[in-house]
Amino acid sequence: MNTIELKELPRQYKNNGQHAEQVARYTLTGEVCKADNKPFTAGGDCGDIQIKSARATICRGTDIKAHIAIDGAKRYGYVNSSYTVMYLMNADEWFEFASLFGTVTRESKANGGAIKMRLKAEGREMTEWLRARA
């Protein structure tokens, strides 16, 4: 696992995941563009990197490995809650991270009520796990 120090970018989105993606993309490419503008099977949010942050949806259902197999990304970036560091992981590291820090929830009834996995809120245990492997 590697880390990338992120550049500061004025916030354009209330949604934390969209802001995390935009900050990471700006750091990596210098571009400021609309977040969530690519389907998850397109290979990644920025190049071959799928970018996530705390409380992000990991996958529909509970099969993380199946999602990894079809999402098209080669690397996974977790942006910390202060938007200052992105932890860059390969698929095996991402699977371990998502398995440890994912939780099963349901979509709202208005959205069909399907089961999905989300990352937990960032806490001390998650931060220590990331730092120990970076």
Regions found by a protein language model. Name each.
Residues 1-134:
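Nucleic-acid endonuclease domains
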